[in-house]
């Protein structure tokens, strides 16, 4: 006899019970890119079965996913949780002015309390939209507060404090010596890398070439490579003005400067790449360096449109990221999915330049590959971690036609997400956060955002 079938959102469903996601369209993103009508059986933190699932004898929590896509959770490979409080405070400025006039003063004004509130705001937004893994770059100080917020939220994440030991216009609150920067990064790595049963990882984060000495870049590379699984995370080739400033200061481009210091290779994730030349793409591909496409941020800061089609053709591995709230202003993966697909078509004057499936891959399995964790997440396959999102496909904005993948990329929005699991844990159920109080997050963000702005005198 079959065991009892208990609804997943029931107050009486025992924690730790198996979960069966029943009757959805499963968008696996596996090597065969299968899209199948199937059930997904979760046990603990693992995907146990995909197919026709009989309820286990000991019972299961059941989610009715009819009319929904069951997909891997989104993997965002470049975000700034520390900037979530700054939404709407830095609009309509180009990159370097945006940094010097708004972002750096605001970051310098953070204290531990405001940074914690900022991280919770960004995490809540992304989790509700189906994001299950992030690569985050923090600000210079108080980064334990970010890791604490991530740990409490249930998000899978790599994160690291920003490293800055030089730069024009850097406020006092962001200034640090090379020794201080490396020592604090090492302390954070020792404390947080591998924490939460491996759900958290560390990424050394030299901000960009203009804010880091050669000594700091080399030190970050050496430190990252000394510990398995630790990443390097920076910005590169984002804006023409930035590239000119680097050439004026160093006599070479930022990609050359990073490569000379060891900030390349399979454990390096660089954001943007808008200004990359073809020869640089080929060299980065040979080195195995990963990149993140941030289409909305690149548009808002007038950086340009990254040639993602050329990057992928050169052999580069590219993920997707919303970047930060003050340069987007959303942290919504559905926005980035759609933008990535549409902008590739415009960049190439070719409607077929990027298919919906390719865009979805960047936001899921390719994002996991960028972070080196594709053996564990990024696709729905038996034995992988239970990181998934359930997304309604029956909204008026998605009907009446189109396959599940096309609907996810071109039609769906964040509010279509009903459930999110990370490591088998229900983080979002029926559109509501289970790990964070959304109302408290919003109210605290309003209060702390006002305090930061006053301290920054903006």
Name every feature range the model reports, one short phrase each.
Residues 85-117, 158-179, 240-267, 287-290, ...:
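Active-site gating loops and adjacent loop-to-helix segments of metal-dependent hydrolytic enzymes
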Residues 87-155, 181-197, 446-454:
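Alpha-helical scaffold segments that flank or form the walls of functional sites
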Residues 24, 40, 45, 67, ...:
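Divalent metal-coordination and catalytic microenvironments
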Residues 154-156, 221-229, 263-266, 283-292, ...:
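Glycine-enriched alpha-helix->loop->beta-strand junction motifs that scaffold or abut catalytic
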Residues 260-267, 309-395, 411:
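His/Asp/Glu-enriched, well-ordered alpha-helical/loop segment
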Residues 146-274:
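Metal-coordinating catalytic core of metallo-dependent amide/deamination hydrolases
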Residues 1-38, 43-48, 53, 364-458:
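Active-site microenvironment of metallo-dependent hydrolases
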């Amino acid at each position: 006899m079959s065991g009892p079938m208990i609804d997943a959102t029931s107050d009486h469903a025992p924690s730790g019970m198996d979960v069966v996601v029943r009757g959805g369209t499963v968008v696996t993103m596996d090597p065969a890119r299968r899209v199948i009508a199937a059930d997904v059986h979760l046990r603990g933190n693992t995907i146990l079965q995909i197919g026709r699932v009989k309820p286990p004898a000991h019972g299961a929590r059941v989610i009715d996913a009819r009319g929904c896509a069951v997909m891997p959770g989104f993997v965002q490979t470049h975000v700034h949780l520390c900037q979530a409080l700054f939404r709407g405070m830095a609009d309509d400025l180009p990159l370097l002015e945006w940094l010097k006039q708004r972002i750096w003063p605001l970051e310098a004004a953070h204290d531990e309390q405001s940074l914690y509130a900022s991280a919770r705001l960004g995490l809540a937004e992304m989790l509700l939209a189906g994001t299950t893994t992030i690569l985050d770059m923090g600000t210079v100080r108080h980064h334990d507060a970010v890791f604490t917020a991530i740990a409490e939220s249930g998000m899978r994440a790599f994160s690291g404090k920003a490293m800055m030991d030089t730069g024009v216009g850097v406020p006092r609150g962001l200034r640090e010596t090379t020794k201080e920067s490396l020592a604090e990064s090492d302390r954070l790595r020792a404390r947080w890398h591998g924490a939460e049963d491996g759900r958290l990882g560390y990424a050394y984060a030299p901000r960009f070439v203009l804010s880091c000495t050669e000594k700091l870049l080399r030190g970050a590379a050496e430190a990252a490579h000394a510990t398995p699984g630790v990443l390097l995370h920076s910005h590169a080739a984002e804006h023409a003005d930035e590239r000119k400033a680097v050439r004026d200061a160093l006599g070479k481009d930022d990609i050359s400067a990073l490569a000379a210091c060891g900030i390349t290779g399979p454990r390096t994730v660089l954001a943007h790449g808008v200004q990359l030349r073809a020869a640089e793409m080929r060299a980065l591909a040979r080195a195995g360096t990963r990149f993140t496409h941030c289409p909305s941020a690149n548009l808002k800061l007038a950086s340009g449109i990254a040639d993602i089609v050329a990057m992928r053709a050169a052999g580069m591995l590219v993920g997707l990221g919303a970047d930060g709230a003050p340069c987007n202003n959303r942290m919504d993966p559905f926005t980035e999915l759609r933008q990535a697909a549409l902008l590739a078509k415009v960049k190439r004057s070719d409607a077929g330049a990027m298919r919906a499936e390719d865009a979805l891959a960047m936001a899921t399995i390719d994002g996991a590959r960028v972070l080196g964790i594709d053996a564990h997440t990024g696709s729905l396959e038996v034995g992988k971690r239970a990181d998934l999102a359930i997304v309604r496909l029956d909204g008026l904005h998605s009907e009446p036609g189109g396959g599940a993948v096309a609907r996810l990329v071109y039609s769906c929005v964040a509010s279509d997400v009903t459930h999110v699991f990370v490591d088998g844990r229900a983080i979002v159920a029926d559109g509501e956060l289970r790990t964070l109080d959304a109302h408290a997050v919003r109210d605290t963000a309003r209060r702390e955002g006002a305090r930061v702005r006053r301290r920054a005198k903006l």
